[in-house]
Amino acid sequence: GIPICGETCTIGTCNTPGCTCSWPVCTRD
């Protein structure tokens, strides 16, 4: 859904629970 994680995932992983990597940023559904 809305990309409100405020995290980047240039190495391919996200630390924020519920967020997935949509390179180069983390997003929620």
Curated annotation (Swiss-Prot):
**Covalent S-S links between cysteines:** C5-C19, C9-C21, C14-C26
Keywords on this record?
Disulfide bond, Knottin, Plant defense
Keyword presence, Disulfide bond: yes
Query: Position(s) of the covalent cross-link Cyclopeptide (Gly-Asp)?
Result: G1-D29
Q: Which domain of life is it from?
A: Eukaryota
- What's noted about post-translational modification? This is a cyclic peptide. Contains 3 disulfide bonds.
Q: Which GO terms describe its biological process?
A: defense response
**Family from the record:** Belongs to the cyclotide family. Moebius subfamily.
Q: What is known of its domains?
A: The presence of a 'disulfide through disulfide knot' structurally defines this protein as a knottin.
Per its database record, what is this protein's job? Answer: Probably participates in a plant defense mechanism (Potential). Binds to and induces leakage in phospholipd membranes, particularly ones containing 1-palmitoyl-2-oleophosphatidylethanolamine (POPE).
- Name the UniProt record assigns to this protein: Cyclotide mech-7
List the source organism: Melicytus chathamicus
